[in-house]
Amino acid sequence: KLISPDGKEITSSSANLTKNIIKTWGIRENTNQKLLKLSNITKIFDDRSISYRKKLIDEKAVKAVNDVSFELFEGETLGLVGESGSGKSTIAKIITGLVRPTAGELEYNNFSLYNSKKKYQISKSRGQIQMIFQDPYSSLNPRFKVRDIIAEPLKFFQKNITKNDLDQSVFDLIDIAGMTRQSLDRYPHEFSGGQRQRISIARALATRPRLLICDEPTSALDVSIQAQILNLLKDIQDELHLTMLFISHDLPVIRQMCNRIIVLKNGIICETNEAETLFNNPKHQYTKELINLMPKIESII
């Protein structure tokens, strides 16, 4: 469990998952089989895809991701850590089809997610890959009530869902996120940042994904709220047997959440290792520098 700044253990604030949720979810046992594979992924942003301001500074193309390869196994949490501009979010967007890779191969469950023309084949994942974004307010439609935000992916991926089943699924998802059902008839601007992120989590779970990509999901939140959201994600992963790709520049959070960690710098992988091994015995100089920059609590006399 995570500890709050005052030294108290922060317990999970998620609702207990009901038998109905477990029964209808179709829980898969963790097999430790390869779920995701990136092979020599490269992304180059040329002068047509970078901002005008960037062009004034430097007209050269930007290689955001450079020959990145790694595997993600079912049931684990893999961390991507690095400073801003290291390529973490670009990798996440490539996996979810928001950005096309310039080169390389991406496989999900042994199927290629990009065809020969680098077009994303959503039919291969069908909602099994979902993403939780850094800013929950920007990722939620301000014109939709919470009920509609959560129901939208359900209606998209389950064309023949009945109204009763839709309503029950929305109730289940808001329960999982630890929110009250009364919140379903309110708009995003009526909630705090932590509550909005809970709504984002409920929406991401609507398609019953196998892989959840968390792109700095707590960096915009207060420290105590961060711990609650992290515990919520860990509880959900344990109960629903999800696989996670967790992206952050916050090393203590990465250490707490992840089984393995990949360190990125300028779009290149510097080091990959088990979490505790990486922190206790870092090999790459950049990894050592990041760890040395971690805030340390000095003894108070």
Provide a role label for each language-model segment.
Residues 96:
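Helix-to-loop junction immediately C-terminal to a conserved catalytic motif
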Residues 208:
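Conserved catalytic motifs of ABC-family nucleotide-binding domains
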Residues 254-256:
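A short, surface-exposed alpha-helical micro-motif characterized by mixed small hydrophobic
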